[in-house]
């Protein structure tokens, strides 16, 4: 019987939200299972985990220095401390399985679990795995990925686990009208949702201030989350005489409601964003981050290739590009419907259930191989 599961994932929404989705799915299938989310005291999980009704345990954040600095010499001791603290949590909650989602806390959790003979499950949300999950995948046969191209040997393709609010999102005409009214928008106008992640995206903001008037002239209204640091700048640059509603917010406190209000989205292409939009059947213009290893472009490709979105490089995005490529979709109910159907078909709505099944399979291997909580 599965009694206690530790889910390690913290720092960013891309690590925290999948962990929470799996925790919710485990709770729904068996309320007796003890669920502990392992994170840091300063990441998003410090706010999100308690808000979702789950227990949070923390370990020190041990980032890998990107260039040689004196901090490199402190890394081994700090990492060992994180492993010890993760191990204390595993002992305290008598963990049957450790599930890691990458990020700062997963590597210490994997090593602490390995030392104790606790089965490990790894979930990788991105096309290219990070260091922590490359390590974790070497320690277990229970590896789940979100993309078929992810280079982790022996992995099972599950997709990204999503919260129930996204999977059951109602985007019927009546629900869309109600969602728009809650944001002070016209219930009947085509609606573009713009957001750039939790901190916003300056290039998206700049394009929207330039495109606001021609979009409004075409009958399009906008719900735009600028990011808290960018709000005043965007508000000052936005035209005042727009003929259609333009609802400007520093952030969106309930993203499912924003998805329900929108016909199309202009956004970055983080793994969670792409998975949520696919599940919601919401077409998007994806603008990958212009730096990093190109993973945001890879995140968006399955949906774009299926016909559920448009893809444009950050350097190529402009008001004229938006008007030439996105506006014709926004004003065509037929094109929106086709893209929505294609978008929804590119997702993995059973991801959380598949990972729960993998967790139970992992727990069963320990029961067969050794007494529960026997010393390694």
UniProtKB/Swiss-Prot annotation:
NCBIfam families found in the cross-reference section: murG (TIGR01133)
Similarity section: Belongs to the glycosyltransferase 28 family. MurG subfamily.
Q: Which cellular component terms (GO) are annotated to the entry?
A: plasma membrane
Q: Which Gene3D superfamilies match?
A: Glycogen Phosphorylase B (3.40.50.2000)
Catalytic activity, as annotated: di-trans,octa-cis-undecaprenyl diphospho-N-acetyl-alpha-D-muramoyl-L-alanyl-D-glutamyl-meso-2,6-diaminopimeloyl-D-alanyl-D-alanine + UDP-N-acetyl-alpha-D-glucosamine = di-trans,octa-cis-undecaprenyl diphospho-[N-acetyl-alpha-D-glucosaminyl-(1->4)]-N-acetyl-alpha-D-muramoyl-L-alanyl-D-glutamyl-meso-2,6-diaminopimeloyl-D-alanyl-D-alanine + UDP + H(+)
Q: What does this protein do?
A: Cell wall formation. Catalyzes the transfer of a GlcNAc subunit on undecaprenyl-pyrophosphoryl-MurNAc-pentapeptide (lipid intermediate I) to form undecaprenyl-pyrophosphoryl-MurNAc-(pentapeptide)GlcNAc (lipid intermediate II).
Q: How does it sit in the membrane?
A: Peripheral membrane protein
UniProt keyword list: Cell cycle, Cell division, Cell membrane, Cell shape, Cell wall biogenesis/degradation, Glycosyltransferase, Membrane, Peptidoglycan synthesis, Transferase
GO molecular function (one): undecaprenyldiphospho-muramoylpentapeptide beta-N-acetylglucosaminyltransferase activity
This protein's name: UDP-N-acetylglucosamine--N-acetylmuramyl-(pentapeptide) pyrophosphoryl-undecaprenol N-acetylglucosamine transferase
What's an example GO BP annotation here?
carbohydrate metabolic process
* EC number(s) reported in the record: 2.4.1.227
Database matches in CDD domains = GT28_MurG
Q: Where in the cell is it found?
A: Cell membrane
> Where do the annotations place UDP-N-acetyl-alpha-D-glucosamine binding?
12-14, 126, 163, 198, 296
Pfam hit, one: Glyco_transf_28
